């Protein structure tokens, strides 16, 4: 428990499963997923896209396997990437078996559309034989006909009933290495369904607002939907669904987690919207800095505030801070640089971007060195 208890999030207690090398649920960090949008049969393009997603921080990547040619390509894809791969399967139970044999870490299936009980048993057998976990993926847009007839429309009750009935199918086959999602494009519906499901079971939950929209609108909708659930302690892994490239989904996912102090990766910029008091062009400065610092993976906070109204206060709370020294029209004004929350020196507008990049890179190197030293000391401490 921290001193600032208003920041604490009490996460729902869930079971822990493995998706390849990544743990999901239990005390594991909330993982970030995305999905490729290339033709899976185009191995080179799919591998390149997965690698870009991985560079952005993706923990897990899903790949669609609609046909035999796609599952045939899966083995070559998996051999060339480092992140665990989830095979997205619908309707064809043989695709699930083929994906497991190809090395998929997880099978995203809907047991209700895989086929007969015997076919489900075959899929479970393949998953067990090859160390695959599964995701039961319920979607408001594809609920079973009988549930729509029972409830009249997609609703939280129908989605939870679908999820739990599918969970029982796997449980009846002595398989519990699975997570569940109950997605909808309506954030209200999705949140209500996830909250009800969280009360009804202890399986890890994969969060998402499906078909959320384009980069801007989808980001806002996902931040509200996924963010509100995470804030309530619900959720073990997330996928931000955007009509955008997979790496953009990953970046948005991490921004949501960073905002809630659940995961930290890279530079978190605190910046003002700017006004007539700004001592430098805040908007342009932030844009350039975010681009030039995108390679940093070490968690660091950087405040960029255009004037002294809020600048010093924000700088005290960040690793590196910059506060504008006067009106933009005032030539020769010097801006104050803060290091570890303490006023350290001044810098002019012309040199400040290069200077801040150097400071952040130096700070990142220091943090990385300390972490490496700590890890190197752990075995020696344990041996003593």
UniProtKB/Swiss-Prot annotation:
Q: Describe which pathway this protein belongs to, using the record's wording.
A: Isoprenoid biosynthesis; isopentenyl diphosphate biosynthesis via DXP pathway; isopentenyl diphosphate from 1-deoxy-D-xylulose 5-phosphate: step 5/6
Q: Which family does it belong to?
A: Belongs to the IspG family.
Q: Which organism is it from?
A: Rhodospirillum rubrum (strain ATCC 11170 / ATH 1.1.1 / DSM 467 / LMG 4362 / NCIMB 8255 / S1)
**Keywords in UniProt for this one?**
4Fe-4S, Iron, Iron-sulfur, Isoprene biosynthesis, Metal-binding, Oxidoreductase
Instruction: Supply the PANTHER family for this chain.
Output: 4-HYDROXY-3-METHYLBUT-2-EN-1-YL DIPHOSPHATE SYNTHASE, 4-HYDROXY-3-METHYLBUT-2-EN-1-YL DIPHOSPHATE SYNTHASE (FERREDOXIN), CHLOROPLASTIC
**Cofactor comment:** Binds 1 [4Fe-4S] cluster.
Reactions accelerated catalytically: (2E)-4-hydroxy-3-methylbut-2-enyl diphosphate + oxidized [flavodoxin] + H2O + 2 H(+) = 2-C-methyl-D-erythritol 2,4-cyclic diphosphate + reduced [flavodoxin]
* Binding, [4Fe-4S] cluster: 272, 275, 307, 314
Pfam families the UniProt entry points to: GcpE
Main function: Converts 2C-methyl-D-erythritol 2,4-cyclodiphosphate (ME-2,4cPP) into 1-hydroxy-2-methyl-2-(E)-butenyl 4-diphosphate.
> So which cofactors does this thing need?
[4Fe-4S] cluster
At the top level of its lineage, which domain of life is listed? Bacteria
Gene name of the record: ispG
Matches recorded under InterPro entries: Dihydropteroate_synth-like_sf, IspG_bac, IspG_bac-typ, NO2/SO3_Rdtase_4Fe4S_sf
- Under Enzyme Commission nomenclature, its number is 1.17.7.3
Kindly list the biological process annotations in GO that this record carries. Answer: isopentenyl diphosphate biosynthetic process, methylerythritol 4-phosphate pathway; terpenoid biosynthetic process
This entry's Gene Ontology molecular function terms read: 4 iron, 4 sulfur cluster binding; 4-hydroxy-3-methylbut-2-en-1-yl diphosphate synthase activity (ferredoxin); 4-hydroxy-3-methylbut-2-enyl-diphosphate synthase activity (flavodoxin); iron ion binding
Can you name this protein? 4-hydroxy-3-methylbut-2-en-1-yl diphosphate synthase (flavodoxin)
């Amino acid at each position: 428990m921290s001193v600032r208890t208003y920041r604490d999030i009490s996460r729902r207690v869930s079971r822990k499963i493995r998706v390849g090398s990544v743990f999901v649920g239990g005390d594991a960090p909330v993982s970030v997923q995305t999905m490729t949008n290339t033709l899976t049969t185009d191995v080179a393009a799919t591998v390149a896209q997965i690698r870009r997603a991985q560079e952005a921080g993706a923990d897990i990547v899903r790949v669609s396997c609609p046909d035999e040619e796609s599952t045939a390509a899966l083995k070559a894809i998996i051999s060339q990437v480092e992140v665990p791969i989830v095979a997205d399967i619908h309707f064809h139970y043989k695709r699930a078996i083929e994906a497991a044999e190809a090395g998929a870490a997880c099978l995203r299936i809907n047991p209700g559309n895989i086929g007969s009980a015997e076919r489900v048993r075959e899929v479970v057998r393949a998953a067990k034989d090859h160390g695959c976990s599964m995701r039961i993926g319920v979607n408001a847009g594809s609920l079973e006909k009988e549930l729509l007839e029972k409830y009249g429309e997609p609703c939280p009750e129908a989605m939870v009933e679908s999820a739990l009935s599918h969970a029982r199918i796997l449980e009846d086959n002595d398989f519990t290495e699975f997570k569940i999602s109950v997605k909808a494009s309506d954030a209200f519906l999705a949140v209500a369904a996830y909250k009800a499901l969280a009360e009804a079971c202890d399986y890890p939950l994969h969060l998402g607002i499906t078909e959320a929209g384009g980069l801007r609108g989808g980001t806002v909708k996902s931040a509200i939907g996924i963010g509100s659930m995470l804030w309530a302690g619900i959720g073990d892994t997330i996928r931000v669904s955007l009509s955008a490239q997979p790496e953009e989904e990953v970046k948005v996912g991490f921004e949501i987690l960073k905002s809630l102090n659940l995961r930290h990766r890279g530079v978190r910029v605190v910046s003002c919207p700017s006004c007539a008091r700004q001592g430098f062009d805040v908007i342009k400065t932030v844009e350039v800095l975010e681009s030039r610092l995108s390679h940093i993976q070490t968690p660091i906070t950087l405040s960029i505030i255009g004037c002294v109204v809020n600048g010093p206060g924000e700088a005290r709370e960040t690793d590196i801070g910059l506060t504008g020294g006067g009106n933009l029209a005032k030539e020769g004004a010097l801006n104050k640089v803060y290091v570890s929350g303490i006023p350290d020196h001044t810098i002019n507008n012309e040199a400040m971007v290069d200077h801040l990049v150097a400071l952040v890179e130096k700070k990142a190197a220091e943090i990385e060195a300390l972490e490496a030293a700590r890890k190197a000391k752990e075995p020696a401490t344990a041996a003593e």
